[in-house]
Design a protein with these regions (language model features):
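Core AdoMet radical
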Residues: 133-148, 154-250, 255-259, 263-265, ...
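Auxiliary Fe-S-binding modules of radical SAM enzymes
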Residues: 1-87, 284-408
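Conserved, mostly hydrophobic/aromatic
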Residues: 98, 126, 164, 217, ...
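Alpha-helix N-cap and loop-to-helix initiation/capping positions
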Residues: 142, 173, 177, 233-241, ...
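Short, charged low-complexity linear segments at domain edges
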Residues: 90-111
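Catalytic cores of alpha/beta
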Residues: 201-207, 266-280, 340-350
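Canonical Radical SAM [4Fe-4S] cluster-binding loop centered on the CxxxCxxC motif
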Residues: 106-146
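Generic structural signal for well-ordered alpha-helices
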Residues: 114, 151, 178-182, 204, ...
Length: 408
């Protein structure tokens, strides 16, 4: 298999208003499954959507926040209070409580990993994403030899956990192709995560057999009406199929699943609540599952002038991260390189437990002899190497951990 590179001249980076209007008329129903998509029912989806719609964060008071902080085990209503505007004046107390929970369950440990982007072909039209199919960027896909070179280079840094990412193209990045990448990764790493397009339970089972341990799926926004306006075409347009991806992954034998909304696409408080409540419901249904959260904020991407993000400032980001910790004390929380090193270092000293290092969002960026790399998905704000992040953690009296899994 040869490396494939393509300069996508299919369309201008942003379609004309006339074409957009035409697409609006011809959009498929975002709530109806496409042929081949596994339908596992809507039990959890219905609960999440109902609770999110009923969540009026402006009704919560300082007394509600104090009550939530006083509890040792927190209910969904406590979680709602901690995410409300009324909680902001208590941010210092919330951060202290979150830090205590983090130290109680994780000690000073902070887990390190890095992502590897093996392809950036995409068949979706998500208007906020740098990889979307209409964006005029360089496309690339690594072959097996190049994947192995990249992973060998990453392993030399001392990292033992890898996150494999592709663009959302079943045609270019087939399940079999991703499976081969997992098999290669198993030679070098103890923990393998996937951030790929959602697949069916049997396909997750196959990827698990190939070596994958956990799956992260970003719902982007849980507001189905907003979701419909942001995802104009492609398989990602189907809202319920994406919401149920984590449960299908668990049915397929994955050890853990990750959740995340792209904060800033819609009302961040409602999206943060829906994300946490979704994870909470799955944890209750699958008690063995390892739960993880990511908390990305919308970042600038190539050729994007259509999104006007609802501002999520640093205090609000801290509020979300701490609320996750207090509501789901055993969950892993990752801080994205979308954030600058100051913010990331502060968050891991309080509530986050996982941090990426040596990050590139381009294709084939770890080995110099892989030419014509594909474009990055988004801009990163923390470009520190593995050693630099490692040393920064030590300076904060934290213990960098490469892996705590042993295979026997």
């Amino acid at each position: 298999m040869e490396t494939k590179h393509e300069d996508t001249h299919i369309n201008e980076s942003i379609l004309s208003e006339a074409i957009l209007e035409d697409q609006k008329k011809n959009r498929i129903d975002h709530m109806t499954y496409l042929p081949g998509m596994e339908d596992i029912g809507s039990e959890i989806l219905d609960q999440v959507v109902t609770a999110m719609k009923d969540y009026d964060y402006n009704t919560y008071t300082a007394e509600d926040v104090k009550r939530a902080l006083s509890h040792t085990e927190r209910t969904p209503e406590d979680f709602q209070a901690l995410l409300s505007p009324a909680a902001l004046p208590f941010l210092e107390e919330i951060a202290q409580a979150a830090q205590m929970e983090t130290r109680k369950h994780f000690g000073n440990s902070v887990y390190m990993f890095t992502p590897i982007y093996i392809a950036n072909y995409c068949e979706n039209y998500c208007i906020y994403c740098g990889f979307n199919c209409h964006n005029k960027i360089n496309r690339a896909q690594l072959n097996a030899e190049e994947i192995e070179k990249e992973m060998a280079a990453i392993a030399k840094t001392g990292l033992q956990e890898i996150l494999i990412l592709t663009g959302e193209s079943r045609n270019k990045s087939t399940v079999e192709y991703i499976g081969e990448a997992c098999k290669i990764a198993r030679k070098y790493f103890k923990v393998i995560g996937l951030e790929i397009y959602p697949v069916n339970s049997d396909e997750y089972a196959y990827l698990h057999e190939c070596g994958a341990d956990y799956v992260t799926v970003f719902q982007e926004t849980y507001n189905s009406d907003k979701y419909e306006t942001l995802h104009l075409a492609g398989h990602k347009r189907i809202y319920p199929y994406r919401v149920n991806a984590q449960e299908r992954a668990l049915r397929g034998g994955m050890r853990g699943v990750g959740f995340g909304a792209l904060l800033g696409l819609d009302d961040f408080r409602k999206d943060a609540f829906a994300t946490g409540y979704h994870a909470y419901l799955l944890q209750r249904k699958y008690p063995h599952a390892e739960i993880a959260f990511s908390c990305p904020r919308l970042r600038p991407i190539i050729n994007n002038d259509r999104i006007n993000p609802m501002d999520v400032h640093e205090p609000q980001l801290l509020q979300v991260v701490c609320a996750y910790r207090l509501f789901m004390p055993f969950a892993s929380i990752t801080v994205s390189t979308r954030e600058c090193e100051r913010v990331r270092d502060n968050l891991v000293s309080i509530a986050a437990t996982k941090i990426s290092a040596g990050v590139s969002t381009g294709i084939g960026s770890h080995v110099e002899d892989i030419e014509d790399k594909g474009d990055d998905q988004f801009e990163i704000s923390d470009g520190r190497s593995v050693d630099e992040v490692y040393q920064a953690l030590l300076k904060h009296n934290l213990q960098p951990v490469m892996s705590d899994y042993i295979y026997v």
